[in-house]
């Protein structure tokens, strides 16, 4: 798939699952959601939404918090996966990438209620 086709398919996407599938196909990622998170590679953990406003810092922070919850599960849970170097937050219109280690003081912190949905 070329980049123009990737953009066209994303624009036509109707669900979060479709957005995820388009990214997986474009980046040639086989995915397994058995650990209850979106796409994962040892380099990148993806968190997808259908259509969020990434310019709204509260919306972006909410998606980031969900990603950090998944990173914490990777760190302390039973999944035999490494913590990826990057987090990619994406929807059908935009994406944001950040280094995972910049957030370690959050996902390693026990003072947060990590059990809340």
Predicted features along the sequence, with ranges:
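A short, conserved, highly charged catalytic patch centered on acidic carboxylates
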Residues: 1-86, 90-107
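Extended charged low-complexity segments that act as oligomerization/scaffolding linkers
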Residues: 113-116
């Amino acid at each position: 798939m070329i980049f123009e086709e990737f953009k066209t398919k994303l624009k036509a996407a109707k669900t979060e699952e479709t957005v995820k599938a388009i990214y997986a196909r474009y980046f040639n990622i086989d995915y397994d959601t058995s650990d209850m998170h979106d796409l994962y590679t040892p380099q990148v953990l993806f968190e997808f939404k259908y259509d969020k406003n990434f310019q709204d810092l509260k919306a972006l922070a909410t998606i980031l918090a969900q990603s950090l919850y998944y990173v914490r599960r990777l760190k302390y849970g039973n999944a035999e996966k490494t913590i990826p170097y990057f987090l990619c937050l994406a929807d059908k219109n935009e994406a944001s990438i950040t280094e995972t280690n910049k957030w370690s003081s959050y996902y390693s912190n026990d003072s947060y209620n990590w059990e809340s949905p």
